[in-house]
Each structure stands twice: as C-alpha cells, then as structure tokens.
C-alpha cells in the first residue's frame, strides 16, 4: 500500500461520518505519512522510509531497530532485497 507506515503498519482506515440526525456518509481517514531518510549505523548507509509522524517521534526516542521491534516489524522490510544478508565493510580507522 502506498500510504502505509513501515514501522507501525498503520494504513488508511474507512468509516462513517455521522451527522446530528444520525445520517451516515462513508469516509476515509488517511495516515500522516512522510518520506524520511534515516541512517542505519549497522549497515553504514542511508535508507528512505515512509513513516508516520507518530512513529517518527518513537523513532527519535528509541531508535529505528527498537521502534520496529516494539511494533512487531522486521528490519528487512525497509532494507532492499539486494542488501539482505550482506554485512557492511568495516571503515578504516585513521591513526595519526
């Protein structure tokens, strides 16, 4: 789905607008999803994710891996398939 949060899995919800006379009209509620670049320290690279603003607050507080784990997600959901199973190369340490 296009408008779905990667961390929480929240998506568009449908329901009714109910007037004072209890007349019901169908409507949808869209999740406030933004595209955000997040740095994965373990893999030493940037990843673009679609994340809800509520999940972004959790992410800033706990970190990406903990936030995804708390919501029952998997980190491989945001990792492109060509990177799954590949360990990042160690960065050379400058000594002077």
UniProtKB/Swiss-Prot annotation:
Matching InterPro entries: Ribosomal_bL28 (IPR026569), Ribosomal_bL28/bL31-like_sf (IPR034704), Ribosomal_bL28_bact-type (IPR001383), Ribosomal_bL28_sf (IPR037147)
Pfam families: Ribosomal_L28 (PF00830)
Top-level taxon of the source organism: Bacteria
GO BP of this protein: translation
Ribonucleoprotein in keyword set: yes
One GO molecular-function entry: structural constituent of ribosome
Keywords from the UniProt entry: Ribonucleoprotein, Ribosomal protein
GO cellular component, one term: ribonucleoprotein complex
Family membership noted in the UniProt record: Belongs to the bacterial ribosomal protein bL28 family.
PANTHER family per UniProt: 39S RIBOSOMAL PROTEIN L28, MITOCHONDRIAL, LARGE RIBOSOMAL SUBUNIT PROTEIN BL28M
Record-given protein name: Large ribosomal subunit protein bL28
Originating organism: Leptospira biflexa serovar Patoc (strain Patoc 1 / ATCC 23582 / Paris)
